[in-house]
Swiss-Prot record:
First-level EC class: transferase
EC numbers on record: 2.3.1.236
Domain Carrier: 1664-1742
Pathway assigned in UniProt: Antibiotic biosynthesis
Gene3D superfamilies named among the record's database cross-references: 3.40.47.10, ACP-like (1.10.1200.10), Malonyl-CoA ACP transacylase, ACP-binding (3.30.70.250), Malonyl-Coenzyme A Acyl Carrier Protein, domain 2 (3.40.366.10), NAD(P)-binding Rossmann-like Domain (3.40.50.720), Polyketide synthase dehydratase (3.10.129.110)
Region (C-terminal hotdog fold): 1042-1180
PANTHER family on file: FATTY ACID SYNTHASE, SI:DKEY-61P9.11
Gene: aziB
One GO cellular component term: plasma membrane
Name of this protein: 5-methyl-1-naphthoate synthase
Region named N-terminal hotdog fold: 902-1027
Domain PKS/mFAS DH per the UniProt entry, residue ranges: 902-1180
Active-site residues, as the UniProt record annotates them: C181, H316, H356
Organism, scientific name: Streptomyces sahachiroi
Length: 1779
């Protein structure tokens, strides 16, 4: 048939993008097509949650009982990615889900079109959306008490379209259309008119329908419009009304010419459209076939399209007999003439598939037709039997019954789509297949060559971008033939680049998949960049500051790869050849290919050549600088790239400047000094041959000058403990050396003509970094002669807003300086990218940094050519947003919860918060426990974990979620059933928790928010994690588990430990144990007490039986579940189960279990069930307050009549030695000074004389750690010389003088500090010849010192002398209010542990992970084998270390193990260099490294001191210099308090530990409050405590020093962190101690018998007064332990919520035990979590004990023995949370 040429059609409209979401979960056009082609039906039961709020009212309940409850429902209409659209959770609740879904669909459709949504900002893009019901919005507006401002836009039709326009910042027409079911075709028509009239250039068109309330269904049922079974039977004999459906669709339209011009994909064409009205007919809702016919005829007439050219009509097809008949007649009359059985018009509709989506039905039909055209096929229109009454065949029509090839006509595939509204509006559109695409230009594919490219992904959150990576990887595996060029083009040019970005560098599909998998899995990969951009989209971001560094980046091989891979690089290199050849006799290409030698001339000239060529590479990749900085010679390239200098002229100048510098080569040197520029200037003042040359950063300066002068300066610096390093150059740049060549440089620069730079160009040569002085003439002399002010230029850029820097060089030279400057400026979010790195693949290094820059938000003009592919563009991060009306359902049993459901789900309410919380509240007491049998743990009736977990699942299911399990379950504290509690289950998005408070007798005064105690938290899992798979063959498992335990045996162990009873009736038939696994078979007795569909009993049985695996026959340690990674299940609970439990070999306290039914099918899985020990005070354990001590000083009286020694020998050559000799002589003492101890033996001394060891603290050029060895050795030598005197009557006493060690403010103090420790040991070994240590303050005079020597009692360890007098060291408990918050580890920081593979180091590492550390570096001298060999390790010790590292990683930490001698400064600096470490900045250090070299003082030699001082003192100093005061959050050093007890054989060890103590004081004096030296007592069973001999332990205890357990040590560490202590001695004080340093300490455990209870004798308190008094005292004791005022603690506030952690729980139990003489079980806070509850418990115990005493004991006041309370050593509560 011919077209009607009298009415030529207007320009067709191109459909360039589309998206959809239909029931049940058809969220892409592809999934919709497969569903349609298969004849699928989405009809199902209405989700219970939808109408639940309406059935609580008896009136509506009766109505809804007969309302149609079937239809095509989407599974998720609450889910929305609010964060993506920058909508607050609170506002999202008030936005109609139709608006939310359309936002997402609009974004998806634009991405499908390859039209970056953010590119529409400010354009005339338009939005036309159809909707005709606002169930959700209407309900919100009617809820007057709770409606808010957000409902204004969130509940309306206009808001659907306007919100899209608002988010996209689109300025074209934006409107909602409501013509009922004709709405979306009406929107299409209106959009087409606007496009034809030029009102808009791109139109977003869609329709949406959601059924959020039953109101419209009730009305439609009343009108007999709906089908009872919810199914639309279009054109079917059984048609009985339509089935409602949910869904939406969006298409994106452009004029065809515009789409072709822009290279857009074209899914199909809209040739014509029209909207008409039925007018007055048989009824407003009645169909009008005549009007439909007139509409069709008019549309085709106007458009000039012959209806005979249409092969298919997507009919309205509601499925009502009247409507189908009218439509069939109209279609037949218009399209039927001339057709026969061989050429029928094919008709169909998708309503039988996805329901009648009403306002969205027209757009749904359009999408179906476009998909059919794409595939050249028509999907079936499901039906049972065509209605013969319609006469389809006679009318030339045929209903599509099966997938049918689309008949082709002269114009290809054509179709009509009809939609008719219930109010009489009718619409129709004519579609045609897309024109053929232009032939693709052939080009070499990147995948064929392996040429790497950058593939960027982005989202609004890290979860979104990782999820997108997973989606893309799955898509790519399904489409492996996809060209990488097309993917790169799609990702770079056809997507918006959002705020959270990632980019993968890959050259092959396999590489790309590897990077995507790493990104999706949260793994680190060098091929993947991930960062947050500075803003949403690229619009406002500035380019990075390009930094052209100076001398030192050269390396052999640089540039070679780029010559072959980057044409623009080679082009620039070759462009420079004539200039270089003329000036220097060689070309840049020749230099690159030769790879050296790197003379100063060649290095300087090639620095310019490489930099300008690399800059061209960056420009070619689409990067533009936001600013430019040059450093020394780098200023030349900087000026050229900025456009200030012509590149050829700049090259000539660079060559001539380089040639001039060659004349002064070989005479100079440079060095990097870790000091500020001004400080270095002061340091070199007066030195003629060395100057401060480069201000690199606030912390680093480069000096330059004569070689000898530089070396001398380095030696002086090293003597002061400052580690400087030489720079690899023999030219003294920026020093007086360059004066002789300045005229030559000026002459070379004279030819330069500087222009205005195109970009901000900072100066490093001038005082003002922002100076616009022209880069010509004298500027370049200044550049060479004056200091480089790099620090100032970078700081100016930072102050001007620059946050991203790019070093353009062959190797990073200044990147570290930029980072230091940024941190000093308080800009932690500054980032530095590089260009190349030595020996690294060049092209990939450049692209990896391009990926990083893009991820940071740097604008990139991408230039990847290719075609658009339909790879996923977004992975929505849905969270539920929904507001139900408040209801008051009838209370079930138990004031809300029904015990028979095995949940604590009570009365439901909604809390208006952001996001909205759903809360179920009930009361729990002994009579309404939601489990079948009593379950007591240590006498506390405890709700089992299975009930809590079931409550969580039930809450999510009640809210309409598809709850398939839980993850990240944290058991904070068990829930006790007594006393009566008010319990809440709270669901907030996908987070769920259970909390309780104790119900008070009188609650009229209201309830405080802080009375609630959270017990357990979890996250709901919406997708099933239990796959359809069988369990491993039970017989195979049984074979590996040869040991059989009867349940009677297990029950006996449980009951011995205090677990009394199991919550549900189940029977363990068999329990077989292997080494790390267990197999059990259990029958669950489903008695009438058990709800038949409840998993609670099965989970309870499985968890209880599985918990047996973590205990043995002698288990006596209380354990409780602390965390469960995941729990999932599927199907109904089976009555008989097999349970396979496996212990994690890396973490023995963690198990996983798999549960199968009798057929072997897995029905339930639990992963990562972790048990932790509950802290117990036991019989000897104490709180940290009793263990942590600090050093104090008390006055000592000097005897007035003390004897004066006859002779004194002053040994050591201290500067103050002569003055001391003079002062002693003045007192009548024959005194003299000698340089060393060898003179002692010949001095003819007697026991009435003294030897004074007084070494010089620091010799010239001596480091403190070297001086410390010398000083300690001098003392040892002196003691050895005295001890060697045969006649004991001639042995004088040895005294040691130290200076300012107590003050700790100088490095000299470090040198003398070992004398404190060594002296204490000598006092223990040789009390017969020891005098003591006197520490002299700066203000003390020699006469004071002389008066003390020999006069003071030699029983003291250390005496301090200052102008105020003499004081002695004493330990005292740290018992004062906390001075600061405990230091938590940052997840974005790195933490070092030296000695990290030792026992204490690994304990420290575990402690750091528990405090939040997620990146650890464990440093050990030996390290570990490579990870690939870990499975082959047979050394048990190494294998144990590997297991510990794996356990740390399993706990969430990234662990790097370094084999490193921490005392090697250079090796340590290299290993911990930020570039080498490739980890976040180091935030904290725990220095555990230590080696013992025991020997009596007479046998101690230099080797002993070297052995112990090396790792401890030298290692600490290396770290101190690398991380100066102020650069760390904490620096914790492990010292020892063995010296305090004067332990035998530890001279060298005590010397090293005293050095650490002094270093902590030094750092504190410099303002760092995070440095502490912990002087530990023996850790029982750990570290050196494992190998300490029994004799040493007995010696320590006899002198008052007792060991501590690991848990006590870690609790003490956490406790001490609350105070600003430079030194903390952690120890247990034993009875009968006599040493003066312990004189103020009471025995650690003695307080258990008495505590400050205000002098109360509880036995005498009248019963009526007891509760009030106990409450008062308990309140005071709790406040004292927490260091809070009594008024700051509410008596009904849970102590756990006040910060009472495991450390303070133990301390609190200890304190209350001392006060009341009542044993408090470790479970006390489970059942008594508040001050009031504790007091009630204590009053009952005290009262009961008093009553018993009165009845049984005539002695008043003696408490009766406590029976049956149980201690932690009697418990292993694997059932506490599990069963």
């Amino acid at each position: 048939m011919a077209e009607n040429v009298q009415n030529p059609p207007v320009e067709p409209l191109a459909v360039i993008g589309m998206s959809c979401r239909f029931a049940p979960d058809l969220d892409t056009p592809g999934r919709l097509w497969e569903f349609l082609r298969a004849g699928g039906s989405a009809v199902g039961e209405m989700p219970d949650r939808r109408w639940d709020p309406y059935v609580t009212d008896s009136r509506t309940r009766d109505i809804l009982r007969t309302t149609t409850r079937k239809g095509s429902f989407m599974r998720d209409i609450e889910g929305f990615d609010a964060e993506f659209f920058q909508i607050t959770p609170r506002e999202a609740e008030y936005i109609d889900p139709q608006q939310r879904i359309m936002l997402e669909l609009a974004w998806e459709a634009l991405c499908d079109a390859g039209l970056p949504p953010t590119s529409l900002a400010g354009t005339d893009a338009s939005v036309y959306v159809a909707a005709n019901s606002n169930d959700y919005g209407r309900r919100l507006l009617e809820d007057l008490d709770r409606t808010g401002a957000w409902a204004v836009n969130g509940t309306t039709f206009y808001g659907i379209a306007n919100r899209i326009s608002y988010f996209l910042d689109a300025h074209g027409p934006s409107m909602a259309v409501d013509t009922a079911c004709a709405g979306s075709l009406t929107a299409l028509h209106v959009a087409g008119q606007a496009l034809h009239r030029g009102e808009t250039s791109v139109a977003i068109v869609g329709g949406i329908n959601i059924m959020a309330s039953p109101a419209l269904v009730v009305a439609l049922d009343a009108a007999s419009a709906t089908s009872p079974d919810g199914r639309s039977k279009s054109f079917d004999k059984a048609a009985d009304g339509y089935g409602r459906g949910e869904g939406g669709g969006v298409v994106v339209l452009k004029r065809l010419s515009d789409a072709v011009r822009d290279g857009d994909p074209v899914h199909g064409l809209v040739l014509a459209s029209g909207v008409f009205q039925d007018g007055r007919s048989d009824g407003m809702m009645a169909p009008n076939g005549s009007a439909q016919q007139r509409m069709l005829e008019e549309i085709y007439r106007r458009s000039g399209i012959d209806p005979g050219t249409v092969q298919y009509v997507e009919a309205h097809g509601t499925g009502t007999q009247l409507g189908d008949a009218a439509e069939a007649q109209a279609i037949g009359n218009v399209f039927g003439p001339g057709r026969d059985g061989d050429n029928p018009l094919l008709i169909g509709t998708l309503k039988p598939n996805v329901g009648h989506v009403e306002a969205a039905s027209g757009i749904a039909g359009v999408i179906k037709v476009l998909l059919g055209m794409r595939h050249g096929e028509l999907p079936p229109s499901p039906h049972e039997e065509p209605d013969p009454g319609l006469g389809l065949e006679a009318r030339g029509l045929r209903l599509v019954a099966e997938p049918t090839p689309w008949p082709r006509g002269e114009h290809g595939m054509r179709a009509g789509v009809s939609s008719y509204g219930v109010g009489g509006s009718i619409a129709h559109a004519v579609l045609q297949q897309a024109p053929p695409r232009p032939d693709r230009t052939e080009r070499p594919a990147a995948a064929a060559t392996g040429r790497p490219q950058v593939f960027p992904l982005s989202a609004a959150s890290e979860q979104g971008v990782r999820g997108l990576a997973g989606s893309v990887a799955a898509w790519l595996r399904a489409h492996p033939e996809t060209a990488l060029d097309d993917l790169a083009h799609t990702f770079t040019a056809r997507r918006s680049h959002l705020s959270r970005r990632a980019a993968v560098v890959a050259g092959t599909t396999e590489e790309l998949l590897g990077g995507l998998d790493a990104l999706a899995g949260g793994e680190k990969s060098p091929a993947v960049a991930l960062a947050s951009a500075s803003g949403f989209g690229d619009g406002g971001a500035a380019g990075p500051a390009w930094v052209f560094s100076g001398h030192g980046a050269q390396w052999s091989g640089m540039g070679r790869e780029l010559l072959t891979t980057e044409p623009v690089f080679a082009q620039v290199i070759d462009e420079l050849a004539p200039v270089f050849s003329e000036e220097l006799g060689w070309t840049p290409r020749e230099a690159i290919e030769a790879g050296g030698p790197w003379t100063v001339v060649r290095t300087q000239a090639m620095t310019f050549a490489m930099q300008v060529a690399l800059a061209e590479v960056w420009s070619d990749l689409g990067l533009r600088p936001g600013a430019i900085i040059g450093h020394s010679v780098g200023e030349i390239a900087a000026a050229a790239v900025a456009g200030s200098l012509d590149r050829a002229e700049a090259a000539r100048f660079a060559c001539r400047r380089a040639r001039a510098l060659g004349k002064i080569a070989g005479r100079g040197a440079m060095a990097m000094v870790p000091m500020a520029f001004a400080d270095v200037e002061q340091r070199v003042a007066g030195r003629d041959a060395v100057v401060a040359a480069i201000a690199a950063s606030p912390l680093s300066t480069v000096v330059s000058g004569d070689t000898a002068a530089v070396e001398a300066l380095l030696a002086d610096l090293e003597a002061d403990g400052i580690q400087a390093r030489r720079v690899n150059t023999d030219v003294a740049f920026h020093s007086p050396h360059v004066q002789e060549i300045l005229d030559e440089v000026r002459q070379a620069a004279a030819a330069l003509r500087a222009g205005t730079p195109r970009v901000t160009l900072y100066s490093t040569a001038l005082a003002d970094p922002r100076s616009d002085a022209p880069r010509e003439g004298e500027y370049w002399a200044t550049n060479l002669a004056d200091p480089v002010r790099f620090h100032q230029a970078v700081r100016a850029a930072l102050d001007d807003g620059t946050r991203v820097f790019l070093e353009v060089s062959s190797h990073p030279v200044v990147a570290h300086s930029i980072t230091e400057t940024a941190l000093d400026a308080g800009v932690p979010d500054a980032h530095v990218a590089i260009t190349l790195r030595r020996e690294q693949p060049e092209q990939r290094t450049v692209l990896a940094n391009l990926a990083r820059l893009h991820s940071l938000g740097t604008p990139v003009t991408w230039s990847y050519d290719g075609d658009l592919v339909d790879v996923p563009a977004v992975r929505w991060q849905h969270k539920p947003y929904w507001i139900f009306p408040d209801t008051a359902p009838e209370q079930g049993a138990g004031l809300g919860h029904d015990p028979q459901t095995h949940t604590l789900i009570g009365a439901r309410t909604t809390v208006a918060s952001a996001p909205v919380q759903r809360v179920w509240q009930t009361e729990l007491h002994m009579e309404n426990r939601p489990y079948a049998q009593s379950h007591k743990v240590v006498g506390v009736e405890t709700v089992p974990a299975s009930v809590v977990l079931n409550s969580f699942i039930t809450a999510a299911t009640n809210e309409g979620e598809r709850a398939c399990g839980l993850r990240d379950i944290v058991f904070r504290i068990p829930l006790a059933a007594h006393p009566t509690r008010v319990v809440q289950v709270v669901l907030e998005q996908d987070k769920v928790r259970i909390a309780s408070r104790i119900k008070r007798d009188q609650e009229s005064g209201g309830v405080r928010d802080d009375e609630w105690l959270t017990h357990t938290t979890a996250t709901v899992v919406h997708e099933p994690e239990v796959g359809a798979r069988p369990m491993e063959d039970p017989d195979v498992i049984r074979a590996r588990c040869p040991v059989s335990w009867t349940w009677a045996k297990v029950d006996g162990i449980f009951r011995t430990m205090g677990v009394d009873g199991y919550t549900f009736p189940w029977v363990v038939e068999e329990l077989l144990r292997g080494e790390d696994e267990q197999f059990s078979t259990i029958t669950v007795d489903h008695t009438p007490k058990l709800h038949p569909s409840s998993w609670t009993a099965v989970v309870d049985a499985a968890l209880t039986a599985s918990g047996v695996l973590v205990m043995d026959e002698n288990s006596n340690v209380l354990r409780t579940c602390s965390h469960l990674e995941s729990l999932s299940f599927v199907g109904p609970p089976p009555p008989r189960i097999h349970v396979h439990t496996v212990r994690d070999p890396r973490t023995p306290d963690t198990i996983s279990m798999t549960v199968a039914d009798e057929s072997g099918a897995v029905v339930c899985e639990a992963r990562g069930l972790r048990y932790v020990k509950v802290q117990d005070i036991g019989s000897g354990a104490v709180g940290p307050r009793d263990l942590v001590h600090e050093l104090a000083w008390e006055p000592v009286e000097v005897p007035a009549d003390a004897p004066v020694p006859s002779q004194a020998l002053v040994v050591g050559g201290a500067a103050g030695g002569p003055a001391l000799v003079e002062a002693l002589t003045a007192r009548g003492v024959r005194a003299r000074a000698v340089p060393d101890a060898t003179a002692i033996g010949d001095a003819s001394l007697t026991c009435a004389d003294v030897v004074v060891v007084a070494p010089e603290a620091l010799l010239p050029g001596e480091a403190p750690e070297q001086a410390a060895r010398r000083c300690a050795q001098l003392l040892v030598d002196a003691v050895q010389q005295v001890a060697a005197v045969p006649d004991e009557r001639r042995r004088p006493r040895v005294w040691a003088l130290t200076r300012e060690v107590r003050a700790g403010a100088t490095e000299a103090a470090l040198a003398h500090a070992p004398l404190w420790g060594a002296g204490r040991i000598v006092a223990g070994e040789r009390p017969d010849l020891w005098g003591g240590v006197i520490d002299v303050a700066e203000n003390a005079v020699p006469q004071q010192v002389a008066s003390l020597i020999g006069a003071l009692p030699h029983t003291e360890d250390v005496l301090s002398l200052d102008s105020e007098g003499v004081t002695a060291a004493r330990l005292r408990q740290v018992a004062r209010p906390a001075e600061r918050e405990p230091v938590d580890c940052r997840p974005d920081g790195t933490y070092l542990v030296t000695g990290g593979l030792g026992a204490l180091g690994l304990e420290a590492a575990r402690h750091l992970v528990e405090q939040g550390a997620r990146r650890l570096v464990l440093i050990g001298r030996r390290g570990l084998p490579s990870r690939s060999r870990w499975d082959q390790v047979d050394d048990p010790a190494v294998a144990a270390q590997i297991a510990e590292v794996v356990a740390l990683e399993a706990a969430g930490a990234t662990v790097r193990v370094l084999s490193l001698d921490i005392s090697d400064a250079e090796a340590t600096a290299r290993a911990l260099d930020p570039g080498a470490l490739d980890m976040p900045p180091v935030r904290g250090i725990v220095h555990c490294a230590g080696v013992v070299s025991d020997a009596l003082v007479e046998k101690t030699g230099a080797a002993n001191l070297d052995t112990t001082m090396g790792p401890k003192a030298d290692g600490a100093m290396v770290l101190h210099r690398l991380f100066p005061a102020g650069t760390l959050d904490f620096f914790t050093m492990f010292s020892s308090c063995g010296q305090l007890a004067r332990l035998t054989g530890q001279v060298s060890y005590a010397s090293a530990n005293s050095f650490l103590d002094a270093l902590a004081a030094l750092r504190r004096s410099r303002g760092e409050t995070g440095t502490t030296s912990f002087a530990w007592a023996q850790w029982i069973g750990r570290g050196m405590g494992e190998t300490t001999g029994r004799a040493t332990i007995l010696e320590a205890e006899s002198r008052g020093l007792g060991g501590i357990t690991v848990s006590e040590a870690l609790r003490s560490w956490a406790y001490a962190d609350r105070f600003a202590l430079p030194y903390a001695a952690v120890m247990r004080v034993m009875p009968d101690h006599t040493l003066p340093v312990f004189s103020h300490l009471s025995v650690t455990d003695a307080g258990a018998q008495s505590a400050d209870a205000g002098g109360v004798d509880w036995a005498t308190v009248p019963a009526g007064e007891l509760p009030e008094l106990v409450l008062k005292v308990t309140h005071e004791q709790v406040a004292a332990e927490l260091n809070l005022a009594v008024d700051d603690i509410a008596i009904d506030q849970p102590l756990l919520e006040l910060g009472v952690d495991s450390v303070l729980t133990v301390a609190l139990r200890v304190r209350l035990h001392r006060c009341f003489a009542v044993d408090l079980p470790p479970t006390i806070l489970w059942s008594n979590p508040t001050v009031r509850a504790l007091a009630e418990f204590l009053a009952a115990e005290v009262g009961g004990a008093t009553a018993d005493a009165e009845e049984t004991d005539p002695v008043a006041g003696l408490p009766a023995p406590q029976q049956g309370s149980g201690t932690a050593e009697q418990l292993d509560a694997v059932a506490a949370a599990a069963g």
